[in-house]
Amino acid sequence: MSNESKCPFHQTAGGGTTNRDWWPDQLNLRILHQHGTKSDPMDPDFDYAKAFKSLDFQALKQDLTALMTDSQDWWPADFGHYGPLFIRMAWHSAGTYRIGDGRGGAGSGQQRFAPLNSWPDNVSLDKARRLLWPIKQKYGNKISWADLIVLTGNVALESMGFKTFGFSGGRADVWEPDEDVYWGSEKVWLGGDTRYGKDQVKAQAPGQGDLVAEPAKHGEEQNRDLSAERNLENPLAAVQMGLIYVNPEGPEGNPDPVASGKDIRETFGRMAMNDEETVALIAGGHAFGKTHGAGPADNVGAEPEAAGLELQGLGWANKFGTGKGGDTITSGLEVTWTSTPTQWSNEYLNNLFNFEWELTKSPAGAHQWQPKEGKGAGTVPDAHDPSKRHAPSMLTSDLALRFDPIYEPIARRFKDNPDQLADAFARAWYKLIHRDMGPLARYLGPEMPNEELLWQDPLPKADQPLPSEQDIAALKTKVLASGLSVGELVSTAWAAASTFRGSDKRGGANGARLRLAPQKDWPANQGTGKVLAALEQIQGEFNNGGKHISLADLIVLAGTAAVEKAAKDAGYAGNVQFRPGRVDASQEQTDVESFAVLEPLADGFRNFTKARYSVKAEKLLLDKAQLLTLTAPELTVLIGGLRVLGANHGGSKHGVFTDQPGTLSNDFFRNLLDMGVEWKATSGDNESFEGRDRKTGQVKWTGTRVDLVFGSHAQLRALSEVYGSSDGKDKFVKDFVAAWVKVMELDRFDLK
């Protein structure tokens, strides 16, 4: 008998067929409970912002600068300088950000975890982070991995002669992989079939998709018709599973620079970069370093998540030659762009336009480009052998900057005006590494730029005295006497606050942008104009009396007053917390195009959908709840409360399971859980339902999928039972008020 067969355990905890295996379409409420105290090793009172402020920032930068040229035998530096490797590390950490849902990005150090730590596009970045470990170990919790990864990229640029725009810290680490990010539904690495498939799902609920590894294929075009229109699935911002942006060989391995330009524009645009920023990032980033494709890809071993224990979290062990240095295999491409790969220059663009290019292949068989007629030979140094020289080389995605009709004039202008490139690259790089940080109130450190940038959603300074408690009480009275209903006041405050996204910290009530384009014109906000007009009148009268309240504060205060009234009408006294200090942004401080991505295509909290989607309404609700950083109990209690308060879009009666709308009762849960009611679909697509009395057959209620899921889904029903019980009334009111205040203050980083 083998030793293995003697083991009394055939499987350990967590193994076996899971609920997700049995019911893959089941709502995944786990995405609402990520990054909690059970996975966080830090003390409950640990304050990262406070720790960061105690950091000797300049000493850290000096240590990072010294590391750049401290080549290690176990992973030698190209050209004796780690700068290009660290730029790629920072770029690939920040570059996962996509503007569609704000997810991805550098904000929490996710590059340390699966799947990002094992993406094909991140080969060798495991080595970059290991090179950083002695410095991280030295400074400990005063610098997060998330901040250190980005700062190291900044210092790398500076160490090679480039003047950066600045750096801000404030990215706190998490300690487990994100489960909410939808990276695509392909089942193999570098697959792209479903994100461009004809029958693709146009919008995805978060956290779906399983992955298996597949060997990289270089120089092989996939068998799909590239002449067909390429519609990249939303919210994805990469052309293939496991890539940051585009395939550098061209779309799916097709070495067509013009087609590559289209992919670049799509993917960089989804990361909130315009054409000029895109050209600047590529031209600036490729001023440094090289790519690696010394030999065939089948020499490379498993990625970190699949590698053996003895490799200690490193992956892609390379059996080609020494497996490092001049024998390194990363992308399979073997390209060095300039003769000064560790010094800032404009040579990348000079080479791009001054040479004519012909297609060739790397030693790994990947499509790349070399100067025609052998020109440029001997001008580029070898990364590890001083006796060798090379010609410059380019990627298909590089040639896109020359042959794309929009990129070409921008790139040519940068070639002829190096100062313009330097400024554009500095600003675009700063935007790249800070795009998911949210408002300036979150920025930390001595190198924060003084200039406010439009993409940061700037707010005016709060320089007015705050209203007193007596003022607030008087304003509540005026609001409640204005003739506006509880439902109107609540839904307007919700419309303002619920644009917040915990992913990139954008949106929220602060700024009162609900009154500005584009938010004032969103279908989801129909009916808020009437409320805003009334509130602006109250604001004007109050401010004309020598005092001040912002409209942003008044919107939230009005909703809060309505919640207090509804609770009082249900028999519960007490005040709902309101903390003033919000300000009103101007239209000039509001980038209409940038804010357009915050538009709710569906908001189950208001029973609103803009159109019919292939993703079920309850999954869109879950996505919204996760972006609002809600827990499952908070999601549940908010739905029940908002329904009985009459906050539905357009005054819809769906889900208003009460005879006393406007009163903060637990009627939604009591009536949903009533076994005297039988539910049946009233639409062919099972989107709307009616509940009939089992005895009389009379219609009692109507509802949507978002309403009925709280009685159908086992976990949500369990939560609904808590609030629908006879002793759950007090808890319902208390929990609703707490969740309401949380949402109203999600963007109040000035209070945190």
From Swiss-Prot:
There is a cross-link at residues 91-245 (Tryptophyl-tyrosyl-methioninium (Trp-Tyr) (with M-271)). Gene3D superfamilies: 1.10.520.10, Peroxidase, domain 2. GO terms for biological process: cellular response to hydrogen peroxide; hydrogen peroxide catabolic process. It comes from the Bacteria. Heme binds at residue 286. The record marks 88 as: Transition state stabilizer. Pfam families: peroxidase. Binds 1 heme b (iron(II)-protoporphyrin IX) group per dimer. There is a cross-link at residues 245-271 (Tryptophyl-tyrosyl-methioninium (Tyr-Met) (with W-91)). Disulfide bonds: none annotated. The keyword Heme applies. Keywords: Heme, Hydrogen peroxide, Iron, Metal-binding, Oxidoreductase, Peroxidase. It catalyses: H2O2 + AH2 = A + 2 H2O; 2 H2O2 = O2 + 2 H2O. GO terms for cellular component: cytosol. Its EC number is 1.11.1.21. Formation of the three residue Trp-Tyr-Met cross-link is important for the catalase, but not the peroxidase activity of the enzyme. Residues 215-228 have a biased composition (Basic and acidic residues). Its cofactor is heme b. The keyword Cell cycle does not apply. Homodimer or homotetramer. Belongs to the peroxidase family. Peroxidase/catalase subfamily. PANTHER family: CATALASE-PEROXIDASE (PTHR30555:SF0), HYDROPEROXIDASE I, BIFUNCTIONAL CATALASE-PEROXIDASE (PTHR30555). Bifunctional enzyme with both catalase and broad-spectrum peroxidase activity. This is Catalase-peroxidase. It comes from Pseudomonas putida (strain W619). The gene is katG.
